[in-house]
């Protein structure tokens, strides 16, 4: 109430992947927001397996305009390793239900999970393109200190970033984890190529044009035309 009434805040980001875990809890919050009729623009996070079709109408009426989903991988085998138990049909069905309710979806995808191969990463890109979410984040699997992947990387003696910038997804020094089948450079190259394939897709750009307008399409086309400079990929090119 204070943010809206005293400061005129309209846009809010709820950084909690468990926000919709307890349906009774989230519906209670939505009811209070609906009563206030603040006309908010809310971005919230959710696990795919916690989104229930019965809550979508309330979420939309409460002002939630975006749900960011951790889809992670297009390979069921790799998803199982990441403890994501839904199959592809479940994922497609949930995303379509959210979009049908008038809520935009930001899909989060990871390339380079421990069991990933070039084929499974391609499956991830294929799923992302099939879903055609209003936005997509493409990440490389990273051994962030304190995470389970970091513990695994140390135990296996895998190379880790030598400086903090190496943990930054978009930095020149970015060094993701290698997989059981691919080098870190191969993972990073696939991720960067996948980003440009997705955001340059005519089907995606046409959807953006219809949904957000020509100005947003131009902005995304400009973004997709730029390539990130990567130390690992320069080393890969030199080796070839």
Describe each region flagged by the PLM.
Residues 4-15:
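Active-site groove signature of glycoside hydrolases
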Residues 7, 41, 185, 219-225:
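A general, composition-driven signal for non-globular sequence regions
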Residues 18-23, 27-216, 239:
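A structural motif corresponding to the C-terminal lobe/cap of the Radical SAM core domain
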Residues 215-240:
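Short, amphipathic C-terminal "tail helix"
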């Amino acid at each position: 109430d204070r943010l809206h009434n005293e400061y005129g805040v309209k846009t809010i980001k709820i950084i909690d992947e468990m926000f919709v875990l307890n349906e009774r809890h989230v519906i209670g919050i939505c009811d209070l927001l609906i009563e206030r009729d603040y006309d908010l623009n809310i971005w919230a996070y959710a696990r795919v397996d916690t989104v229930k079709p019965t809550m979508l109408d309330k979420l939309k009426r409460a002002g939630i305009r975006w749900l960011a989903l951790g889809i992670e991988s297009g390979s069921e085998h790799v998803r199982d390793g990441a403890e994501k138990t839904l199959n592809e049909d479940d994922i497609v069905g949930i995303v379509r239900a959210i979009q049908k309710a008038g809520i935009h979806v930001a899909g989060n995808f990871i390339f380079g999970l421990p069991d990933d191969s070039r084929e499974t990463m391609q499956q991830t890109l294929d799923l992302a393109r099939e879903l055609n979410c209003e936005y997509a984040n493409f990440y490389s699997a990273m051994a962030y200190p304190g995470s389970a992947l970091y513990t695994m990387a140390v135990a296996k003696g895998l190379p880790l970033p030598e400086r903090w910038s190496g943990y930054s997804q978009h930095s020149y020094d970015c060094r993701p984890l290698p997989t059981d089948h691919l080098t870190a450079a191969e993972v990073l190259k696939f991720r960067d190529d996948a980003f440009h394939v997705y955001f340059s897709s005519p089907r995606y750009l046409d959807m953006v044009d219809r949904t957000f307008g020509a100005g947003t399409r131009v902005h995304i086309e400009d973004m997709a035309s730029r390539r990130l400079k990567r130390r690992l990929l320069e080393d890969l090119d030199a080796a070839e």
